[in-house]
A protein has these predicted regions:
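A conserved short coil-to-beta-strand element within the FAD-binding core of flavoproteins
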Residues: 1-4
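Glycine-/small-residue-rich beta->alpha transition segments that form the dinucleotide
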Residues: 22-24, 28-33
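Glycine-rich phosphate/pyrophosphate-binding beta-alpha loops
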Residues: 31-34, 38, 68-71
């Protein structure tokens, strides 16, 4: 009414329509992560619901807030990016540019770490930076991060013995 949403018209499990009235309505509809070349999201997340809301004059807030993970395993393969968890950096993994020098404090907040990585990638003219997990030791890697270890092996990297390429997604 008057371009204000006072609830939602929905269907229950038996396909019966019901009206749910509310003083405020939050439209949480997924995101746009699938639009990015490198993303941990599924490719079908393209912001369709956001576009529909805009077409109907719905006032949207904070749509520019997109979470970017600083470190995912770089690959040329299409599909979802594989997250190299922030906890790996929290355990002590280090990041390096192509010159072999560290360029940032690895435990910076995600948005700042992502910015630092992107700046280094631009400086190096590379689609990734290097992560050194070897400093954690083989036992820690295999026991604390077994899924990451296995995924790196699938991509041709032994993260217990060599640096791995990582990129924001």
């Amino acid at each position: 009414k008057d371009n204000v949403c006072y609830g939602v018209l929905a269907k229950d499990a038996n396909n019966n329509e019901m009206c749910i009235k509310a003083g405020y309505t939050i439209f949480a509809c997924g995101g746009i992560g699938g639009l990015y070349d490198h993303s941990t999201n599924y490719p079908h997340l393209t912001g369709d619901a956001i576009a529909i809301a805009i077409q109907h004059g719905v006032k949207l807030e904070n749509v520019d807030y997109v979470q970017i993970h600083p470190t995912t395993l770089y690959t040329k393969k299409k599909g979802r990016a594989f997250l190299i968890s922030e906890s790996v950096r929290g355990e002590g993994a280090k990041l390096y540019g192509k010159d072999g020098n560290r360029f940032a404090n690895e435990v910076l907040p995600r948005d700042i770490m992502t910015q630092k990585i992107r700046e280094q990638m631009k400086k190096d003219d590379m689609p990734y930076v290097w992560m050194d997990m070897t400093v954690l030791g083989e036992e820690v890697i295999k026991n604390h991060f077994p899924h990451i270890y296995e995924k790196c092996l699938e991509e041709g990297y032994d993260c217990t013995k060599e640096w791995i390429p990582v990129t924001p997604a």
